[in-house]
Amino acid sequence: ADTIVAVELDTYPNTDVGDPSYPHXXXXXXSVRXXTAKWNMQNGKVGTAHISYNSVGKRLSAVVSYPNGDSATVSYDVDLDNVLPEWVRVGLSASTGLYKETNTILSWSFTSKLKSNSTHETNALHFMFNQFTKDQKDLILQSDATTGTDGNLXXTRVSSNGPSQGSTVGRALFYAPVHIWESSATVAGFDATFXXLIKSPDSHPADGIAFFISNIDSSIPSGSTGRLLGLFPDAN
């Protein structure tokens, strides 16, 4: 199975598998929900998620905010050296199930830094998408994810006339592997930001968007639509 660390913007409470009874931001390591926070998801409004981690504090933090100032914060103390392989890929994932929503990514940026004692070098990877083209060569698109419509990344499928569809899942990973940790590193860390628009015709939008870090050959587990957000093979 893939090794996944994720920050979920979970719009649908699957209380049968241990979700809180409201939309929430969650940090997940492997397939365990490590920490959750209540999130007032605003249907049809653009929200911004900012995720950060550094090897000194060993804390994965995320803030999801809206233009009206409403925000939710979740953080989890974790040493990524113990969880992830040294080289990883970063991506965005989303899914719908019985209920649906659009999972539109308007922009996405990422910066990682790895400072090593032995060589005094800093390895940094940085990318920024302020829009997505139809033929976006530096992204690996999986399953239903598409780019280019209105300059956006649509992580799940929408009909040609716009409405979201149910039981769809998609992911976009940056093509270049990221050196996320190294035993001799003095400082390792990253910052990621994405702006997303979740819009649903249903009174229950579902299921959510996640920023994730995985082994470089990660693929979408079969049957991971709905509550599994395209990340996990079973409902832990």
UniProtKB/Swiss-Prot annotation:
Q: Which InterPro entries match?
A: ConA-like_dom_sf, Lectin_LegA_CS, Lectin_legB_Mn/Ca_BS, Legume_lectin_dom, Leguminous_Lectin
Q: Which UniProt keywords apply?
A: Calcium, Lectin, Manganese, Mannose-binding, Metal-binding
Report whether Metal-binding shows up as a keyword of the record.
Answer: yes
Which residues bind Mn(2+) per the record? E8, D10, D19, H24
Which PANTHER family does its entry note? CONCANAVALIN A-LIKE LECTIN FAMILY PROTEIN, LEGUME LECTIN DOMAIN-CONTAINING PROTEIN
Family recorded in the similarity comment: Belongs to the leguminous lectin family.
Q: What does this protein do?
A: Glucose/D-mannose specific lectin.
Tell me the subunit arrangement: Homotetramer.
- Return the protein name: Concanavalin-Ma
